């Protein structure tokens, strides 16, 4: 008997078939206590603070995926914070979990809190078990089921292309120079989303034949998310065009930028969309609501609910963005005596923040032990 205790998934899951064969030859059983895998992701981000310099680092840690291949797109289109980027899958990493199943062992989930969001009861996820089969068998199953193959191809295509979120906050000074490259990136993203939708559309008829709740959830969720983000891209493009044609300066004396934020009057905003985009918005909501209802208390439903709460249309809102070194700040145009109370408070808070950052940098440089962050 072998007992493994780990907080990572490892980076050699491709050797699982070889390991299983060896264990069977020697009639060995493996039990593992390990992490919960992030949903459709290989890594999670862990915050580590150097005890001597107090410097904090966000370090990637291998903890997934829960399946042989990533079956859902990350769709890293908009920066919405770490809590949205990672979700619990409710299962262990594919390689370690399959290793135990093939040899009569157990995989004990240890949730160390590294993944934000809701936890899922394994009893509720039994209908959604990953395909714990060999690599060859997994590929064969995908080829025999057009819907599964379409999901895998659409997820792979978007994951390879959408690597960085679009900037939604632009400095008001010289905003037209920033709008051009932002619009170019936006159009490229919209094209990638369209490509994913074309792939899924080709398997629409196959949806009627698919019996796996897991793959049906994948298909409907991915289609809904692609459509929703396509509408958001259209809305953002309209804002960029309007600001480019008629650039404006923030009225708030503490602001120096414009941020594309979600419109609270979502229904009104969607009714103002052109017919094609309005239909996309309708289909997006239908797919996402179906997932939230038909697959309740699962990662798919959690992501669908999150998408439904994220408005499909944007509007400009005044914001503050630290300019590049040497750039003017909103309160630099007037002497202290002429600043408003709000500007004075903002100026003091900003300068205090910069002093703290400077002190931390100096402390790190003068530390007796100059170490790189560890590889977790």
Per-range role (PLM):
Residues 1, 24-31, 103-106, 297:
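Loop/turn elements at helix/coil->beta-strand transitions in domains of secreted/extracellular proteins
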Residues 222, 226-229, 307:
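"A position-specific structural signal for the A-helix of alpha-solenoid helical repeats
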Residues 8-98:
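VWA/integrin I-like adhesion module and closely mimicked acidic/polar interface patches used
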Residues 215, 220-222, 280, 300:
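Structural signature of alpha-solenoid helical repeat junctions
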């Amino acid at each position: 008997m072998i007992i493994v205790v780990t907080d990572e998934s490892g980076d050699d899951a491709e050797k699982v078939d070889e390991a299983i064969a060896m264990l069977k030859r020697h009639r060995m059983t493996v039990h593992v206590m390990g992490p919960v895998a992030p949903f459709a992701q290989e890594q999670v981000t862990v915050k580590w603070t150097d005890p001597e310099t107090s410097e904090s680092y966000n370090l990637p840690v291998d903890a997934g995926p829960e399946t042989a291949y990533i079956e859902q797109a990350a769709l890293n289109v908009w920066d919405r914070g770490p809590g949205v980027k990672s979700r619990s899958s409710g299962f262990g990493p594919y390689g370690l979990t399959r290793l135990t199943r093939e040899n009569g062992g157990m995989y004990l989930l240890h949730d160390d809190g590294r993944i934000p969001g809701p936890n899922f009861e394994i009893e509720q996820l039994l209908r959604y078990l990953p395909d714990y089969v060999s690599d060859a068998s997994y590929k064969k199953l995908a080829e025999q089921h057009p819907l599964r193959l379409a999901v895998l191809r659409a997820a792979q295509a978007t994951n390879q292309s959408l690597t960085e979120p679009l900037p939604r906050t632009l400095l008001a000074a010289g905003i037209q120079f920033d709008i051009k490259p932002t619009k170019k990136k936006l159009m490229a993203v919209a094209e990638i989303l369209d490509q994913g939708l074309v792939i899924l559309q080709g398997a629409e008829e196959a949806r009627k034949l698919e019996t796996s709740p897991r793959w049906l959830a994948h298909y409907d969720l991915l289609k809904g998310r692609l459509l929703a983000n396509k509408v958001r891209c259209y809305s953002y493009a309209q804002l960029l065009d309007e600001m480019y044609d008629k650039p404006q300066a923030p009225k708030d004396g503490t602001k120096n930028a414009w941020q594309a934020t979600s419109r609270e009057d979502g229904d009104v905003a969607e009714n103002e969309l052109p017919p094609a985009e309005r239909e996309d918005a309708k289909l997006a909501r239908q797919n996402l609501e179906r997932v939230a209802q038909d697959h309740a208390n699962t990662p798919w439903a959690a992501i669908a609910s999150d998408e439904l709460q994220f408005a499909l249309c944007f509007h400009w809102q005044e914001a503050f963005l630290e300019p590049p070194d040497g750039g003017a700040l909103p309160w630099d145009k007037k002497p202290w005596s002429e600043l408003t109370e709000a500007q004075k408070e903002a100026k003091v808070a900003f300068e205090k923040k910069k002093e703290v950052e400077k002190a931390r940098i100096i402390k790190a440089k003068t530390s007796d032990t100059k170490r790189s962050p560890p590889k977790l």
